[in-house]
């Protein structure tokens, strides 16, 4: 990273100290978990600047350590109060300081009173090398075809041509909308294909192909050909384990991997460690990408432009602004249901709308006829802090500009004098992805000496022996387990509840989730209640859509009777309502 970018990031982290101190001092102890995770991430981020000669580095780093210590002491006090113990912060971190910074005080605390027997159980259940969890795959000599390169270069298209020739194949997607798109494409081209995502299942009679979100992969099933899309997600702290599981566990002799070039070295390391074979093909743009060096003016908008911002609020603000000028826009952002995204895409493709206003959700998914990508901002909130975009993010978004046969040159512009930064990010070499994220598998339930929460915490602190793997962030698992602790459920049920996809950080969704836990395990109901929506504004409708998905996922995972047709019909009604609101902006 260039020195200017380093200094900007450092200054941003430094300036956040007073606000963070104020917040944690006035936060109830049981709500400190998210702050603890966020502060540890900032400490790790600061550590990267250690040798950059920054003034005040030592002082800022020590202040963050003091904040973490304050939070950790309160968490230990709360643990002692709940469990009748008398652990001290200093005792816990005395010989475990690196683990404390890496996984948090409570995770380290739990390892202090784990007997050696339990450690041996972990060794027996979890092999030293994650690849050895997948015995079926290790008996095969698999061949990987690496389709790696820039955005919008036909990587997935070429792999799909091969998939169509298979007797039995799977397309593994990062997004429901991509799984849906390829499910429809295969069926329209005469290849019978079923659809499986966390939100729906459409089983086509006689189909031997499946298009699914990657978390739905059955690694015990045999396939002829598989496509793993957007492989760079293997480095994602929350979801990356699903890509690693597919890479290591697929029971398939021909596997096509599509994604960014900066994953190449890691993939080769893992493939060679599995004693499998590979071929590599790099993809480069056939359509040139041209940077505009004049700062973009909002009045200079043109047909086919896509304006990129990093919050739903900014998407709506810009859409209202251009709507007031008589310029209709399609809108794309993370909370938008896939059905609505699709309608918005179609309106843009069919020129019913002139421009696109979008978040970085556009970086993955459908290729659109975009003439020019315009960065209206160069910072985003990543879940823990507001930071500058990295080079891979800029390239992924900028690469959406240009469409063969429609726009034979793709243009990139930016707002607010940020052209140099965008140009630098486009031309700089991406940071190499060095680690694949791994998650705990269900075999953890075989360990009987500890509750599931403590086992997961211990798992997260155990050092990986292979240098190209790291543990996933289990903080969401811990939050859910803390919320359901009072129900006294068996571990198998707890594990199943952890696999239900919903926004754990959203209090309304957590309340809906706990209501279903109540209905099933306290009231012992055979069915759970359908969600309702009384206020039909944009935010409430989007939340209602998420509740419908939760109703579906909860019912499906526990094999409950539920009104599946109502789910599909109600989703369509909600999507229509949302789309009407967006059309009137």
Predicted features and spans:
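Post-DEXD/H (motif II) to motif III coupling segment of the RecA-like Helicase ATP-binding lobe
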Residues: 169, 225, 232-288
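Conserved interdomain hinge at the start of the Helicase C-terminal
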Residues: 157-163, 238, 242, 249, ...
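Conserved two-lobed SF2 helicase motor
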Residues: 149, 205-225, 348-367
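Walker A/P-loop
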Residues: 139-158
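Conserved strand-helix element at the start of the C-terminal RecA-like helicase core
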Residues: 167-182, 256-258, 264, 299-325, ...
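Inter-Walker segment of RecA-like/P-loop motor cores
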Residues: 177-182, 186-222
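Conserved segment of the helicase C-terminal RecA-like domain
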Residues: 253-263, 351, 368-430
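Non-catalytic terminal extensions of ATP-dependent helicases
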Residues: 1-124, 136, 441-585
């Amino acid at each position: 990273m260039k020195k200017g970018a380093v200094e900007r990031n450092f200054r941003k982290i430094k300036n956040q100290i007073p606000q963070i101190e104020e917040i944690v001092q006035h936060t109830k102890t049981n709500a400190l978990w998210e702050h603890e995770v966020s502060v540890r991430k900032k400490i790790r981020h600061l550590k990267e600047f250690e040798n950059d000669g920054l003034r005040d580095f030592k002082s800022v780093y020590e202040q963050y350590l003091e904040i973490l210590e304050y939070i950790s002491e309160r968490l230990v006090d709360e643990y002692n109060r709940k469990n009748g113990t008398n652990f001290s912060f200093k005792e816990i971190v005395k010989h475990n300081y690196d683990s404390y910074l890496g996984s948090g005080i409570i995770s380290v605390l739990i390892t202090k009173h784990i007997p050696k027997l339990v450690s041996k159980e972990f060794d027996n259940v979890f092999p030293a090398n994650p690849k050895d969890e997948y015995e079926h795959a290790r008996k095969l000599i698999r061949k990987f075809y690496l389709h790696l390169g820039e955005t919008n270069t036909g990587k997935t298209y070429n792999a799909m041509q091969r998939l169509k020739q298979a007797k039995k194949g799977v397309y593994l997607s990062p997004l429901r909308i991509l799984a849906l798109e390829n499910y429809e494409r295969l069926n329209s081209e005469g290849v019978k294909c079923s659809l499986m995502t966390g939100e729906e299942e459409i089983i086509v009679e006689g189909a031997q192909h499946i298009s699914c979100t990657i978390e739905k992969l059955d690694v015990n099933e045999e396939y002829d050909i598989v496509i793993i899309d957007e492989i760079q997600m293997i480095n994602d702290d929350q979801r990356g384990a699903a890509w690693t599981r597919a890479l290591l566990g697929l029971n398939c002799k021909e596997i096509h991997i599509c994604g960014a070039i900066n994953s190449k070295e890691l993939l080769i390391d893992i493939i060679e460690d599995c004693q499998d074979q590979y071929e590599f093909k790099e993809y480069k743009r056939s359509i040139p990408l041209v940077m505009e060096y004049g700062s973009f003016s909002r009045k200079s908008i043109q047909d086919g432009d896509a304006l990129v911002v990093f919050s739903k609020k900014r998407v709506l603000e810009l859409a209202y602004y251009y709507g007031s000028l008589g310029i209709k826009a399609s809108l794309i952002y993370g909370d938008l249901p896939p059905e609505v995204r699709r309608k918005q895409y179609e309106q843009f493709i069919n020129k019913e709308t002139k421009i696109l206003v979008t978040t970085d959700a556009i970086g993955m998914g459908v290729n659109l006829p975009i003439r020019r990508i315009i960065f209206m901002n160069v910072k985003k909130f990543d879940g823990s802090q507001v930071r500058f975009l990295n080079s891979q993010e800029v390239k992924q978004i900028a690469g959406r500009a240009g469409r063969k046969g429609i726009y034979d040159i793709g243009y990139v512009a930016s707002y607010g004098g940020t052209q140099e930064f965008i140009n630098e990010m486009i031309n700089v070499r991406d940071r190499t992805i060095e680690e694949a994220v791994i998650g705990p598998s269900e075999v953890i339930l075989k360990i009987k000496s500890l509750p599931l929460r403590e086992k997961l915490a211990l798992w997260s602190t155990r050092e990986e022996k292979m240098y190209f793997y790291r543990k996933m962030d289990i903080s969401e698992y811990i939050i859910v387990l803390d919320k359901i602790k009072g129900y006294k459920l068996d571990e198998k049920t707890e594990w199943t509840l952890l696999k239900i996809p919903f926004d754990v950080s959203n209090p309304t969704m957590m309340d809906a989730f706990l209501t279903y836990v109540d209905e099933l395990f306290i009231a012992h109901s055979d069915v759970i209640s359908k969600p309702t929506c009384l206020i039909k504004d944009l935010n409430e409708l989007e939340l209602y859509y998420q509740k419908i998905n939760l109703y579906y996922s909860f019912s499906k995972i526990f094999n409950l009777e539920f009104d599946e047709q109502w789910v599909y019909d109600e989703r369509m009604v909600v999507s229509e309502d949302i789309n009407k609101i967006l059309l009137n902006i």
